[in-house]
Amino acid sequence: MPKLRSATSTEGRNMAGARALWRATGVKDNDFGKPIIAIANSFTQFVPGHVHLKDMGSLVASAIEEAGGIAKEFNTIAVDDGIAMGHGGMLYSLPSRELIADSVEYMVNAHCADALVCISNCDKITPGMLMAALRLNIPVVFVSGGPMEAGKTKLSDKLIKLDLVDAMVAGADSNVSDEDSAKIERSACPTCGSCSGMFTANSMNCLTEALGLSLPGNGSMLATHADRRELFLEAGRRVMALAKRYYHQDDESALPRNIANFKAFENAMTLDIAMGGSSNTVLHLLAAAQEADVDFTMADIDRMSRLVPHLCKVAPSTPKYHMEDVHRAGGVMGILGELDRAGLLHTDVFHVAADEGGNLKSVLAKYDVMQTQDEKVKHFFMAGPAGIPTTKAFSQDCRWPSLDNDRQEGCIRSREFAFSQEGGLAVLSGNVAENGCIVKTAGVDESNLTFVGSARVYESQDDAVAGILGGEVVAGDVVVIRYEGPKGGPGMQEMLYPTSYLKSRGLGKACALITDGRFSGGTSGLSIGHVSPEAAAGGTIALIENGDRIEIDIPKRSIKLALTDAELAARREAMLARGPMAWKPIGRERFVSLALKAYAMLATSADKGAVRDRSKLED
């Protein structure tokens, strides 16, 4: 029978000093011997997705203590990618994922915690905590802050739904009046919560449900809705149940590595493809798989992308639906139910929402709105927006008049009526990206599934933005932004501003953009990221020159630079002849701190999840 990890610091006379310190935190005589449950919160007033999390740890703690545990909360950092976007702050976003993972590991291992609840929400926080949870391999439950309500405003007497990307595009579009731009800006992000579309934060929170590590509704229940309170309480109860199964019954199915196994990673990626999730999720799933020692690679993602249909279309791929609409249609469990009926889901995997001995199949039987007989579950998924600006969680209890069970023309479709039989993400490869690259096909217009254009090369995102706004980029160009990968940036910046500015200049469907950087979950259009190997690692993207012909064929999963092998070899020799300046950007002025340099020294390319290169750390 496994011994409580916390016994290391709570048992024996030699631990008298540690017990004295535990007592100073409020632990009583009769508490020693109970499991110590760490609560990793990420409250901050910098991020709308986290501004309402201050009291959530106490809520979880109350359920843990009622179930017989000791709850101890700590906090970790959270970067707002939208606020950090478009300037040097974005260099810190992806590296913060590793810091979050390390900080959770440090706190949990330093204090010998027995189990963990992760209160996350936005872009790098959920992945960082996920990496830590799989690294630690102790019982864990994830519970996020939830999505914000979609913005709504009237323009030209027409009510429209909005999100962050609409504000960015309108702000850069000279055809939009100052009055309308300000109106959109003030309405785009009306409440606390993660941005309202299927951007990175919401995508990752949905994927934790598919991985089996969070409760149904975690990815879709609005941050403002009173029903979300129960998710936090149930997370506390569930983690205690998992801890008892592991420490009292020696049941290893309660451990995250046995829940998030290879089949679960396939389920998560299947969901991601079906719902047209953010391309960043590929990066984070690859990183999490490495922490779990699961052999899940770009090859698996490529294989799955050819099989899974696009069943759920949400902003930024359409203005019609946001996360509040996904929830009304049954949330993640609704999508998983359709995937199961299509024969595309592993249902024999463990799940934290399953009762002891249960699995995903039993969870779907209860929580898939198309098959459940539980009226409480149906009531749960009818939770809707109030349309009142607020930064407070649980501040409203509005309901939709009915569920969206329309699987033919609704937000979630059956396989027969899929938005497309091709999924929402695709892996492309070719001489531009020998180890692959990612495109969010859910956001690509059908007319752009094949594209041939001339390269317009930039050595940084800043130069690309200046070029786009300055009129250098014209219809038919393939904008190439390089040296923005994990190592070359460093930090693999998101390219939401370049894609937004292309849209604002009417070039959203007339140009392509490829980069060794990445894209915000808010990006749509022919935007191809994660080019691997990156420029700084000797990738072919570093050898592209202005005017080169680039051929993109999404149906054939191909991206090709129209040069012969001999021509490429000659360019590579010329690059190597630059000596110490080889594989470095020409003329880029950028301050890179020591912290970022340390990250860059160990960073792998995107096809490996941009994680640390373990080979450089082995003895």
UniProtKB/Swiss-Prot annotation:
UniProt key word Transcription: no
Gene Ontology terms for molecular function: 2 iron, 2 sulfur cluster binding; dihydroxy-acid dehydratase activity; magnesium ion binding
Cofactor note: Binds 1 [2Fe-2S] cluster per subunit. This cluster acts as a Lewis acid cofactor.
InterPro entries tied to this protein: Dihydro-acid_dehy_C, DihydroxyA_deHydtase, DiOHA_6PGluconate_deHydtase_CS, ILV_EDD_C, ILV_EDD_N, IlvD/EDD_N
List of residues that carry N6-carboxylysine: 124
Domain of life where this protein originates: Bacteria
E.C. number(s) listed in UniProt: 4.2.1.9
One GO BP: L-valine biosynthetic process
Pathway where it operates: Amino-acid biosynthesis; L-isoleucine biosynthesis; L-isoleucine from 2-oxobutanoate: step 3/4; Amino-acid biosynthesis; L-valine biosynthesis; L-valine from pyruvate: step 3/4
Binding site for [2Fe-2S] cluster: 122, 195
Amino-acid positions noted as binding Mg(2+) in the UniProt annotation, renumbered to this chain: 81, 123-124, 494
Active site (record annotation): 520
One Pfam entry name: ILVD_EDD_N
GO terms under cellular component: cytosol
Cofactor section: [2Fe-2S] cluster; Mg(2+)
Keyword set, alphabetical order: 2Fe-2S, Amino-acid biosynthesis, Branched-chain amino acid biosynthesis, Iron, Iron-sulfur, Lyase, Magnesium, Metal-binding
NCBIfam families: ilvD (TIGR00110), PRK12448.1 (NF009103)
Family statement drawn from the similarity comment of this UniProt entry: Belongs to the IlvD/Edd family.
Protein name per the record: Dihydroxy-acid dehydratase
Protein species of origin: Shewanella sp. (strain W3-18-1)
Designated gene of the protein: ilvD
